[in-house]
Amino acid sequence: KTKKIMRYSSAFPENQVFTWDDAKSLRRGKYMMMHSLIYNMNLLRKSGLQLPEHTFYVDNLFVFVPLQYSKSLYYMNVDFYRYFIGREDQSVNEKVMISRIDQQIRVNELLMANYHSDRQFPTVLKNYLINHLEITTVISCALLNKGGQVEHQEKKEALLADLKEANPEVFQLISKNVVSKIAMSKNKPGQVLSNGIYTVTQRFFGFN
């Protein structure tokens, strides 16, 4: 059964070369992952992409880092990749992700560290990069809330403190959304509400 098909035709012109100025902003919840992208090798080299070894969830970095160097794009509305979700041992399974939360946190922090605030990005690209950072941070916080232990809340507070210290301006941008505020909440009611939103979103979008 097909749970989710990722399409970008509402934002990207199809079957033609275009720039970010020709694109429309992707709405929240619509993000690109590794299976959606094919990069030119020269662009990958220029970006200096280095993925941490023996770490899951680095596909976020594969998308995020080189994308900042992209100028022209070509979108094909074709299913290049299909991914089965539902096995208990999958890296995106909720329980597995919580058990590997340190790796998710590491990737989250590397995303912030690799965001080039000093560069002038086209508006659509900048919005996407900020949204990608936001959704990754929300996922990290939501999983830590689901973990439910004191150590999970300590890790969440440490993550948010590290992100804020790394880039205060961007942190402010990714923490002003209502869902972000709930996921990042330090109080118990906020964490309970975060768990409820996570469950509803999980059923609606069909992830893990």
Residue ranges and their predicted role:
Residues L51-E53, R119-T123:
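Short helix-to-loop capping/linker segments positioned immediately adjacent to catalytic or ligand/cofactor-binding
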Residues V78-R87, N93-Q120, I139, K146-P168:
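Catalytic core of nucleotide-sugar-dependent glycosyltransferases
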Residues K1-Y74, F84-I98:
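Donor-binding/catalytic cores of nucleotide-activated saccharide
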Residues K146-N208:
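Membrane-interface aromatic/basic loop that binds lipid-linked glycans or pyrophosphate carriers
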Residues L125-N131, Q153-E157:
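Short, charged, amphipathic alpha-helical segments
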Residues Y128-L143:
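Amphipathic alpha-helical repeat scaffolds of TPR domains
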Residues F121-N127, F171:
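Short, surface-exposed acidic
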